[in-house]
Amino acid sequence: MADIKTIEGVDVAGKRVLVRVDFNVPIKDGVVTDDTRIRAALPTIEYLVKGGAKVVLMSHLGRPAGEGFEEKFTLAPAAARLGELIDAPVAFAADTVGDDAKAKIAALSNGEIVVLENLRFDKREKKNDPEFCKMLAELGDMYVNDAFGTAHRAHASTAGVAALLPAYAGFLLAGEVKTLGGMLDDPKRPFVAILGGSKVSDKVGVIDALIDKADTIIIGGGMCFTFLLAQGHEVGTSLKEEDWVERAGEMLKKAEERGVKMLLPTDVVVADKFAEDANTATCTADAMPSDMMGLDIGPETEAAYAAAIAEGKTVFWNGPMGVFEMKAFEHGTKAVAEAVAANREAATIIGGGDSVAAVNKFDLASEMTFISTGGGASMELVEGKPLPGVEALR
């Protein structure tokens, strides 16, 4: 995993450095409401500024149609927020590869920054179009990828352009690959993996890969009901994937054969409807009422999961235990987050997506060893899939 070239030690003075960042941040009324991803790119940006580079930042934001400018997807607020964070002027180009971008880049002095407009305003970005790659490459003398969140996409700005310029990894991307790669290649044991979320179908590859790597796998979230079905339990009106029951059973068997502990809920919080004001009850996992749905793990399960987490020396968590967005069903996710935070002996790695939202919600982010910035990218790396954005830097 260590064989990607990083920007550290590279002479960037006076060079136009084209940097793919992940500024896909939430914006409301023209203001960035969560700047986590912008902050995550600061070490690379500040390193380049200090080294005297002419820094050209490019990113996507949201899912525009790809037919040109759309006000709600402009990166202008992200550029403004970056300027506030580094306390320096940041130029903004009203296009990506057009006249304004070229003019703003030409006007840069060493150590100055321009942010280009949303890459995905041009549909050629997602198609990794050769012509578009060439146009991007003309804007820089070297290329840096620091957008781990999109490293699993073979787009023009993540893969195509890297073939046309001297290409390096930024500090964020290199750190992600090193941490997640190290976790898989040589984890301190016991290695405990906690997997939640609603669908087994989304996590099959990850669970399969972790059965080969982990000592204990903890299952929560909506997908636990497909596993409970595989064990022969009735799950009422809970979310279930009938087509995946057999596959879930195979994974339970594989774990058993490998001597991997696979923990499933022994009790669940059930509700009569999917709503904050639902009538709720706690019942054992083998006696769920036929007219109710499971929306969280129960207290007995919380205690068992917390005990297993406490034993880990490497703890990886991806996916909530229940519908933590609703107060009535947040307790299981909160209990797991607290258990992970409380394990001071372990390397604790939060694998992107909803788990990050959860540790932020419960104000526990600072207690974790490492929080991944990539949801899909972290999962694909854990699954053992090559990431186009990383492969392009080898």
Descriptions of predicted regions:
Residues M1-R394:
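Active-site loop-to-helix "anion-binding N-cap" substructures in soluble metabolic enzymes
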